[in-house]
Structures are given as C-alpha cells and as structure tokens.
C-alpha cells in the first residue's frame, strides 16, 4: 500500500493545504516534513531522486497616492515535491515569519517592504522528507528542475543544486534549508503587456522565422540558433511612450525544442539539424509578471526535408479520420472508390484496431483511416451465399460455398429489406453478401 505524501513546514504553515490529501493542522514552528511513497525509485532526471520545486509569489509595496492608500507588500507560495511520477504541494502561509527574504546586498527585507523589479532570495528553513521507516538508511539525492533553487543539508553549508542525504532510522531526510533565488516582487499598478517586436521594423510580431545553414556535416550549434533569434526579435513593455526591454532565455527555449523532438545535443552544443523545427521563446516581465510567447520557426535550407514513404490505396468503404487515440476527427470522410495516400504499414492504435496514417505532401498528418476500409477483413462463410447487387437483385449467378474465405470491406450496410450486407470484391461493382451468412 502506498502512503500519501504530505508537506508540513516550519517556514510553511499553521494550516497546510496538501494535495492530494486533506489539509493538516500543524503548529507554527513545525518542521517541513514530506511523507513520500514507501519505495524509492529514481527520478526520470538521473541527477536526483526527488524533485523539489518551490513556487513563490511576491507582491511589491505600493506607496500612498492621491487616488489610493498605501498597500504593503506580501509574500506567498508553495513547495511542490515530485516523486515517482506524482506531484504533491503544500501552501506556505502568507508572510511567514520563519522564511527569510534577502536582497542583492544580502540585507534582510520584510514582506511588507518588498520593491518592484528587484531580485530577492527566499530561504525556507528546516525541510524534511519522510519516506517511511522501510527506507531507513538509504541514500537519496534531492534536487530541483528550477535552476534558481538550491539546498543546504546542514547549517553553515554552501547552497547546492543537489544534496545527497542518508535517511535516518525513521526514513527521514533532513535539510537545513531550501533557497529560491531571483524572486521578483510584482507591481500590481503596472498594467503594460509584454510584446515581441521585429528588430528591423519595430513592428509587433506574434510569430517568427529564421533561416540558418547547417555545416558540411549537416550540423548546427545551439549558439547559432540563439544568435539568429536574438538578432531578429526582442521583447518589451510599452508604457508612457517608451519601450522597456524584457529579457528572455533563448538558449533554454532552443534546448527544450530539441528535447521535444528527441534530438541529441553534444556537450559543446552541436546537433544534427532537421529541415525545420519550432522554438517557443517566452518573455516574462520582472515588473508585473506578465508574459508573452513567440513561436519561431527555424528553417535549415541546406538540409533536405525528409519524405515519409507512402503508397496509394483505394478506399473500399466510406471512411472517417481518427487521431492517434482512435477518436474521430471532425466529420470529414473519404468516400468509397477514391484513392488516398497512406503510410506503407498499418499502425495499431489504442483500441487495438489497425489503421493507416494519412500522408500529405510527404508528411505524416497524424490522421488515421481504419485499415478495414482499405484492405478489408477475411471472414469464413458459415452458409452458402449469393452475391447481391441490391436487396432484391443478385449481382451474378455465383454461389459462394460454405467454408469459403471471403474478404469484406468496412462495416455492414443496412439495405431496404432491413437486412445487413458486407461489401465484397476489390472493385467498384455492387457486390454484397448477407452478414447472416458469416454468423
């Protein structure tokens, strides 16, 4: 039986809203304890076993004006722990006295005094992870996917991106602190949106495109892609007739795009270039937290666009399109006796049925057609059968004998006489056999 994971916190809470279990009342000075599943399995990130990601929200203080009273700053947030493919979260209390906020000069700052557009470091002390006594003595590594998050195992240690700890006799891993750097206090009075602009024209853009040639080995370097994007686009907020630049991490965006396409990158940043790929560049304002994303299409002209092998097939029964989950896509269909370009082989989807993927202009479309509407299904007659043209007329004088294997196409048709028939014969002729003859 698995144990629910709870997060309890000294810097965190008098009352913690913990998912997926009910809220748990704790004394204000309780240490942060995370109760995890009983079996420790490695995180998908091989660098650490438990992924801890704090999320901190800071609001800047607003000075008194003629139109509004002074508003103090505030700090709220949560700590999430990802373990064994599941995520669990505990909320930090507003303006927790146990959490320490420091500015760039390492001066301690009260939540009420937070200023906009300044980077702060938030330190949450006494964090523990409870994996149960059955894991006592095991060694685990704790880390975070967020590069701004660091940990200290003991008081006086230098913060590190990962820490290796040995569980005590109760299966508990104890940390001296969790630190979150680059926390920006949001100015709630500043309403300007973030937009991307073309460097040359100054025009606002919602999509982008760059072209880069690969080297003679068909490779690109991440730095080349980053430079191409950064030289063509910038992000900014417009206010009081002026633009204020908003920074964005293009390198991480490029790496994420390559990872999504399962393209390997060498230790020095080289990768085998595809003909085209899309980089989603996100810019977030440190002043008011607003953001914008610019999808940039990167084209590599001297790398051939790969063509998916395909074949032409005749549809023998009206066919709808389906997605990879075997769910119908829209109402469009390919009518019988028309041809369609499909992949060379069928694919078995989630429902266990074989489908052909539709190919258009040498590209896989992600749309599928039931293979039964193209290749048919072989069935054995249980009775002698005539071949019909209509419900009343036979197509010919042929009598199909019991035990004969016949290929039928698609689902059955209901004729005017109320009986159901299968289409047989890989042709455009009206040739049908009663379904009852196969039962």
Swiss-Prot record:
Q: Which UniProt keywords apply?
A: Cell wall, Glycoprotein, S-layer, Secreted, Signal
Q: Where in the cell is it found?
A: Secreted, Cell wall, S-layer
Among InterPro entries, the record links this protein to:
S-layer_prot, SlpA_C_lactobacillus, SlpA_D2, SlpA_N
Pfam families linked to this entry: SlpA, SlpA_D2, SlpA_N
Is Cell cycle among the key words of this record?
Answer: no
Instruction: Provide the leader sequence positions.
Output: 1-30
Gene Ontology MF terms in the entry: structural constituent of cell wall
- Please indicate if the UniProt record lists Glycoprotein as a keyword: yes
Modified how = Glycosylated.
* GO cellular component terms attached to this protein's record: extracellular region; peptidoglycan-based cell wall; S-layer
Coiled-coil spans are none
Task performed by this protein: The S-layer is a paracrystalline mono-layered assembly of proteins which coat the surface of bacteria.
Listed name of the protein: S-layer protein
Report the source organism: Lactobacillus helveticus
Gene label: slpH
